[in-house]
Amino acid sequence: MGSTSSTPKSTICTFSTTAPVTSSTPYFFNPKKEHIILAFFAGVLLTLLIVALIFLIVKSCRKCHSSAQTQDPPSEPPTKLSSLSKESLTYASMTFKPPEENSNDLTRNHSSGLEPTIYSQIKVTDSDLPLP
């Protein structure tokens, strides 16, 4: 009876608590409503900026070309250039008359007082003419 020790056995209890692991995606992969709206307006503003730049470039190119044309002296005298511009607006006149054998009284009464004339502008393909 005396061979056992009177000290109690110590028991070590270990409890492991693990934090709940959530599989979260990075912040930039989870867009919010505000971020989508901001991206939309940024895209619209960027598009307007690009269109404005293209417009200004085209406008400045037109100014460069028009100022280059006014600085170059014309190779021909101005009187000849003005006569060419008047000649470029040439009109043709044509009168259509129906054949007499196929016309009836209705068309004969209406077409007797009228003389239809067709005007057509003739385009000149000479590139030496100044543009208005």
UniProtKB/Swiss-Prot annotation:
Keywords: Membrane, Phosphoprotein, Transmembrane, Transmembrane helix. Residues 104-124 have a biased composition (Polar residues). It is found in: Membrane. InterPro entries: C1orf162. The chain crosses the membrane at residues 36-56. GO terms for cellular component: membrane. The modification Phosphoserine is found at residue 111. Residues 95-132 are annotated as: Disordered. It is a single-pass membrane protein. This is Transmembrane protein C1orf162 homolog. It comes from Mus musculus.
